[in-house]
Structure formats: structure tokens, C-alpha cells
Amino acid sequence: TFSLNFQKQFDNPEQELMIDANWNIGKHYRESSQTLDYWNPTMPNYEKRDVSESDNKRAVVNINYSHPFFETLKMEVGYNLNYSNRYSIYDYYLNGSDVRNDDMSYEFYNTEYINAVYATVGYSYGKLSGQIGLRGEITNLNGRKEMLGKDNDSINKQYTSPFPTLHLSYQITDMQSAQLSYSRRINRPN
């Protein structure tokens, strides 16, 4: 794992530039086995062993800049890059054999790029405050599954997604406030 962090403070403490970059490389190995012994003599016993290993690479870069225009108005802009690359091998063996079962074994390649930019403006005036923003993402997904002697399955997708945000708040008393929010989000598996 490699990380780089940079923070620039300006004369105004509300104005700042932050850059974070992370790079991770990982290897994973797993072996498991399963045995089914039947009491019924007409059914043969069954043994399965599988081995999987993978190489994973991941990079994340965040650049965020915030700038106050007045005491009541602040803008934030930023960029985010999320890159992941995974290569996995899945080998299956049946009935105690050390010969790989090519009908079930496969290799999988996966690459994902997500580039995003965002801008938000926050304001406050008396008892009213709010924030409005927009994040735009371009996602590229590439995946390929290879099996010996079979047609390879692959997926190549690119899509653009907008993510608007709106948040309004009104301070009724020192102990009460009314809020209204809208945001569009996406949850991705890691």
C-alpha cells in the first residue's frame, strides 16, 4: 500500500486544497474441499476441491478545493478517480483427482475506471441555509471470462451518470429546525 496526502491552507482558513492518493496491490489464495458421503450404496461418493487465486490492484485519487466567497457563501469543487484491476483464476477438481476440470475452471479479468467531478455551493442567510450540488461520473467497465475450449464471455460498458444534491434547512428555534433534502446516490460493492 502506498499513500500520498497533501493539504494546502490559504490565508483564509476556510479556503483549502486537499489531495489524497492511495495505491493498493494485493494477492489472494484460497483452497477449499467438500466431500459428500452417501449412505445409499447406489449413489457414488462425491468430492470437490477448488482453488482460487487473484491479483488485485486499486488506485484512488481525490482532489478537493473549497473557497469561501463571503461569510455566507462557500463553493467546493473536486475530482475523483477510482481504478481497480483484478485477475482471478478458479480451478476445480472432482472426485479426488489432481486433474483440473476444464468444464468448470476459468480465468476472469476485470477492469473498472470511475472518473467523477463535482461542484457544490453552500449558503446561509439568517435562519435559512442550504447546499446545492452536482456530481458527474463516467464509468468504464471491462470484464472477460475465459474457459478452455469455450467461447469467452466479455462485457464492455461505459455510462455517464449525474448525481444532483439539494439540502435546505430552516432554524425555527434554538432547539428546532426543519430540513428538506434530495440526493441521488449509488452503492457499489467493493
Predicted features by range, described:
Residues 106, 162-163:
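Short coil-to-beta transitions that initiate beta-strands within beta-rich domains
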Residues 111-115, 157-162:
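Outer/extracellular conduits and scaffolds centered on Gram-negative outer-membrane beta-barrels
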Residues 140-142, 174-190:
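Surface-exposed extracellular loop regions of Gram-negative outer-membrane beta-barrel proteins
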